[in-house]
């Protein structure tokens, strides 16, 4: 962790693109498209250049409305590389909640996937304290990303990019609001990198690993565990648009994944599905559970049926996800406990 404590996410991407430019970081199963570290860095820089050319206030919130995939991933990276606050919108939170988030965050621009446009328009109409000038919407293709042509934005040049620091705020993520209105959590580049480092240390992630992201990256688990974990370890990331119990195991095998992070509900879905997976047991090292307590019976049944260890963990949005973790096998794990 100490080696990355003074880094920004822009520094992480630059380092990976310099060291292994042609190695794959992101794979999207629906299109079978691979994005190398160099390509990912270039895409992030392009978005950053447009955002810095958009006349936004320094450190402004840029909301992201998109399902998992290339567009959402590069929208996040481009926003933070540009020195702005990525504000992912929870697509199932409801119009009223999203209206509150857009107002409370003082969002100035929204990177919006085409299929999310009606939801975003309704949320803007529901803003409780509507600003005099509503946030600008830039449409995104779910695979190709933002459509800048016709946006009225002129990008700055890459050499002129203002670089974020480790202390720059990179993320404004809202809690679920189960006990009231959602609460916004600010995390700096240093916080986000520390979050990824915690995952790397606890699970011994290396550049040869490949993680499967089945949780939406508008939640802290999907973003800070799987995305940031792969960024810090310079390892591979496979990101389907949504979780499917029917296709999950085939995707794990097809893309040679070595780990995945899930929540108890998804482990239950996999147990209830009748698919008999063919897996590379030498490659698939572990799964991890977080976001809610994992019932011990589901834990035991899953490991017995699939012979894949589950590492139960615990995290908070305020801490960038993981704060507690059981160890990897063969060390002793505590079923029914996040490692306490």
Predicted features along the sequence, with ranges:
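Conserved pre-ATP/AMP-binding loop-to-beta segment of ANL
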Residues: 6-7, 21-24, 155-174, 181, ...
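Gly/Ser/Thr-rich phosphate-binding loop
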Residues: 257-262, 271-333
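Conserved AMP-binding/adenylation subdomain of ANL enzymes
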Residues: 193-210, 220-258, 273-274
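Conserved AMP-binding A3 loop
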Residues: 34-38, 170-194
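Conserved AMP-binding
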Residues: 66-69, 90, 205, 215-219
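A short helix-loop-beta submotif of the ANL/AMP-binding
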Residues: 67-87, 91-95, 100-109, 209-210, ...
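Conserved AMP-binding/adenylate-forming core of the ANL superfamily
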Residues: 2-5, 25-69, 73-77, 94-99, ...
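ANL superfamily adenylate-forming
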Residues: 115-166, 273-274
């Amino acid at each position: 962790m100490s080696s990355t404590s003074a880094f920004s996410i822009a520094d992480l991407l630059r380092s990976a693109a310099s060291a292994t430019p042609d190695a794959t970081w992101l794979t999207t199963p629906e299109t079978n498209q691979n994005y190398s570290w160099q390509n990912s860095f270039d895409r992030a820089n392009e978005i950053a250049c447009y955002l810095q050319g958009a006349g936004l206030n320094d450190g402004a919130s840029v909301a992201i409305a998109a399902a998992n995939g290339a567009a959402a991933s590069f929208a996040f990276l481009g926003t933070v590389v540009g020195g702005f606050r990525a504000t992912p919108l929870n697509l199932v939170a409801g119009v009223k909640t999203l209206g509150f988030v857009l107002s409370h965050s003082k969002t100035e621009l929204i990177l919006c996937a085409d299929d999310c446009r009606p939801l975003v328009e309704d949320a803007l109409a529901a803003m409780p304290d509507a600003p005099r000038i509503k946030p600008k919407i830039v449409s995104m293709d779910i695979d190709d990303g933002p459509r800048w042509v016709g946006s009225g934005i002129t990008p700055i040049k890459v050499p002129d990019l203002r670089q974020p620091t480790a202390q720059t705020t990179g993320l404004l993520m809202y809690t679920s609001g189960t006990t009231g209105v959602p609460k916004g959590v600010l995390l700096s580049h240093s916080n986000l990198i520390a979050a990824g480092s915690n995952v790397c240390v606890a699970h011994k992630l290396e550049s040869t690993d490949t993680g499967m992201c089945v949780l939406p990256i508008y939640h802290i688990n999907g973003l800070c565990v799987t995305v940031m974990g792969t960024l810090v370890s310079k390892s591979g990331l496979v990101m389907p648009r949504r979780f499917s119990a029917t296709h999950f195991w085939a995707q794990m095998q097809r893309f040679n994944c070595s780990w995945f992070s899930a929540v108890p509900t998804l482990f239950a879905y996999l147990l209830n599905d009748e698919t008999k997976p063919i897996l590379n047991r030498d490659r698939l090292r572990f799964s991890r559970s977080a976001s809610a307590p994992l019932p011990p019976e589901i834990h035991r049944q899953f490991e017995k049926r699939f012979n894949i260890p589950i590492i139960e963990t615990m995290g908070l949005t305020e801490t960038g996800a993981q704060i507690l973790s059981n160890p990897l096998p063969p060390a002793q794990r505590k079923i029914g406990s996040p490692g306490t």
